[in-house]
From Swiss-Prot:
It comes from Coxiella burnetii (strain Dugway 5J108-111). NCBIfam families: lgt (TIGR00544). This is Phosphatidylglycerol--prolipoprotein diacylglyceryl transferase. A 1,2-diacyl-sn-glycero-3-phospho-(1'-sn-glycerol) binds at R139. Coiled coil: none annotated. GO terms for biological process: lipoprotein biosynthetic process. It is found in: Cell inner membrane. The chain crosses the membrane at residues 19-39, 56-76, 92-112, 126-146, 173-193, 199-219, 227-247. GO terms for cellular component: plasma membrane. One of its GO terms (molecular function) is phosphatidylglycerol-prolipoprotein diacylglyceryl transferase activity. Catalyzes the transfer of the diacylglyceryl group from phosphatidylglycerol to the sulfhydryl group of the N-terminal cysteine of a prolipoprotein, the first step in the formation of mature lipoproteins. The keyword Cell inner membrane applies. Pathway: Protein modification; lipoprotein biosynthesis (diacylglyceryl transfer). It is a multi-pass membrane protein.
C-alpha cells in the first residue's frame, strides 16, 4: 500500500496571484501541441503554415475550455447547473469534461476550416495526433490535485488519497495518463506519420480513445453525484465513450472504403 505524496496544488505565487499546477498542466499541454504541430507543418505535403498552426491552437484551446466546462455541467452536474446556471462560470471550483471539450473542438475546428478554406476532415486529421500529450498533462494535473481517484483495491500499488477515506485505491489518474496519454500518443503519432485516407487518423483516435477510456473507467471511482448510470456498473464516462467507439470504428471502415486522400 502506498500513500499519496502530498503536493501543494499551488505551484508558485506572484504576489496575490496563485498559479496552480493544474493550470500549468494545461499550458504545458498546449505548448507541446503547438511544438508538435509546427514540426508536422514542416512537411510540405501537409500544406500548413506556421501562422495557420498558431491560429489552429487558439481555436482548439477556445473549444476545449468552453466545451470542457459546459460539457461537465451538462453531463456530470446538470441538476446543479439548472438550479444555479452561474456555476458554469465558477471555473475555480473545478470540473472539466473531455467529451464536452471534444464537442467544443469539433465546432471550433469547423469554424477554422471555413475561415481557412481547408477541408474539415483534413484539419481534424492534423489535430488529433497532438491531443494525447495534452491529455497526459491533464491527468498529471488530476494526480497532483489528488482528485478523480480510483476504486478501492488490494493491489500492492493501491494508494491512500486525501479526502478519499482510509482504504487504498487505484491511482486511476496514472492509468489514464498511460492509456489516454502515452499509449494513445504512440499509436496515433505512428499511424499519422504517413499520409492516410482522409479522416482515417481522426477515426482511429475516436476508436482508441473510446476503448482506452471505457477500460480505465472500470478502475475509476464514479462521480459521487451520479454513481453508476446503468446496469449497476456503467459509468457516465463509459456511456459517453461508447458512441466514440461505434462512430470511430464505422468511420475508419468508411475512410478505407473510400480511400480519399
Amino acid at each position: 500500500m502506498l500513500y499519496y505524496p502530498h503536493i501543494d496544488p499551488v505551484a508558485f505565487r506572484l504576489g496575490p496571484l496563485k498559479v496552480h499546477w493544474y493550470g500549468l498542466m494545461y499550458l504545458v499541454g498546449f505548448a507541446m501541441a503547438w511544438g508538435l504541430a509546427l514540426y508536422r507543418a514542416r512537411d510540405p505535403k501537409r500544406h500548413w503554415t506556421a501562422q495557420q498552426v498558431g491560429d489552429l491552437i487558439f481555436y482548439g484551446a477556445l473549444g476545449l475550455i468552453i466545451g470542457g466546462r459546459l460539457g461537465y455541467m451538462l453531463f456530470y452536474d446538470f441538476s446543479n447547473f439548472i438550479a444555479n446556471p452561474l456555476t458554469l462560470f465558477q471555473v475555480w471550483r473545478g470540473g472539466m469534461s473531455f467529451h464536452g471539450g471534444l464537442i467544443g473542438v469539433i465546432v471550433t475546428t469547423w469554424i477554422f476550416s471555413r475561415r481557412t478554406h481547408k477541408r474539415w476532415m483534413d484539419v481534424t486529421d492534423f489535430v488529433v495526433p497532438l491531443v494525447p500529450l495534452g491529455l497526459a498533462a491533464g491527468r498529471i494535473g488530476n494526480f497532483i490535485n489528488g482528485e478523480l481517484w480510483g476504486r478501492v483495491t488490494t493491489v500492492p500499488w493501491g494508494m491512500v488519497f486525501p479526502n478519499a477515506g482510509p482504504l487504498p485505491r487505484h491511482p486511476s489518474q496514472l492509468y489514464e495518463f498511460l492509456l489516454e496519454g502515452a499509449l494513445l500518443f504512440i499509436v496515433i503519432w505512428w499511424f499519422s506519420a504517413k499520409l492516410r485516407p482522409r479522416f482515417a487518423v481522426s477515426s482511429l483516435f475516436l476508436l482508441c480513445y473510446g476503448l482506452f477510456r471505457f477500460t480505465a473507467e472500470f478502475f475509476r471511482q464514479p462521480d459521487p453525484q451520479l454513481g453508476f448510470v446503468a446496469f449497476g456498473w456503467l459509468t457516465r464516462g463509459q456511456e459517453l465513450s461508447l458512441p466514440m467507439i461505434i462512430i470511430g470504428g464505422f468511420a475508419l471502415w468508411w475512410a478505407y472504403r473510400h480511400k480519399e486522400r
